[in-house]
Curated annotation (Swiss-Prot):
Disulfide bonds: none annotated. Belongs to the metallo-beta-lactamase superfamily. Keywords: Metal-binding, Zinc. This is Metallo-beta-lactamase fold-containing protein ST1585. The keyword Metal-binding applies. Monomer. Pfam families: Lactamase_B.
């Protein structure tokens, strides 16, 4: 039976699958995946009868890890911000991508896993971040949202906004800045405000799942606060330790970015 509608799939590491979410929108014409999880994931995509595009919100390893596996199964094209295809399709680019991730994430790099092999040139298409696609029953628009990364894009499908890491994360009722080193604080804030102005009905976080758009507004207030942000989320066990380490990375990046303002 053909896939239809929106699907939300946990695609984090086996110790904490819910830390990363991949979204699939199945239209009558096209099926699109938003991000590709971590390489150490056991995410199940077997319900998909086809896959036309994989939109990468950005190239951090927790969003691209399953690309080689997915492209072995499906004849999909990968959409990435213009100027950054080389990091997926060359040995030198792949090395830089993984080394940068290890430097920022520390032990978490080995929990998530890196991108294990480069992709074929013809599998990756560069986009500017303002393209539109008719999925058949749904209209998809790419939106350039730099700040978290220079190559960050969000995806608007009708009234559903998929923000990647450009508008925060959300676990156990707590909003978490998605601000690891090296972010551009000013651009991050501009992208966050611009997405709030879109007035989506539902927001899909890459870390935290589907949430109310009010969470983005809460995150904006959090980021504008004069006080240093403190995050306390205790979910226990190995998953709790992974989340704690990721929060530490994000808050470190936020502190460093504010020094340059």
């Amino acid at each position: 039976m053909p896939c239809r509608g929106l699907h939300s799939i946990p695609a984090g590491p086996v110790e904490f699958p819910e830390i990363a979410t991949v979204y699939v929108m199945c239209g009558e014409k096209l099926t699109v995946m938003i991000d590709a999880g971590v390489s150490n994931s056991i995410a199940d995509f077997s319900f998909l009868d086809k896959l036309d595009y994989i939109v990468l919100t950005h190239l951090h390893i927790d969003h691209i890890g399953l690309l080689p596996e997915l492209l072995q199964v499906y004849k999909a094209k990968v959409l990435v911000k213009s100027g950054f295809k080389k990091y997926l399709t060359s040995e030198d680019g792949l090395k830089k991508l993984n080394e940068s991730a290890e430097k920022v994430l520390g032990d978490l790099y080995y929990v998530y896993g890196g991108l294990e092999k480069k992709l074929d040139q013809d599998k990756v298409i560069e986009v500017e971040g303002n393209e539109e696609f008719d999925l058949g029953g749904y209209r998809m628009r790419l939106i350039y949202t730099p700040g978290h990364a220079r190559h960050h894009m969000s995806v608007l499908v009708d009234d559903f906004l998929f923000t990647g890491d450009s508008a925060g994360a959300y676990f156990n009722g707590v909003v978490i800045p998605t601000t690891p080193p090296v972010i551009d604080y000013k651009m991050y804030m501009e992208s966050l405000k611009r997405q709030i102005e879109l007035k989506p009905k539902v927001v899909g976080f890459a870390h935290g799942g589907l949430v109310s758009p009010k969470i983005m507004e809460e995150h904006l207030k959090q980021m504008l606060s004069k006080e240093e942000i403190q995050i306390n989320v205790d979910i226990g066990g190995v998953a709790g330790e992974i989340l704690r380490k990721q929060i530490e990375v994000n808050l470190r990046g936020l502190r460093e970015s504010k020094k340059s303002i």
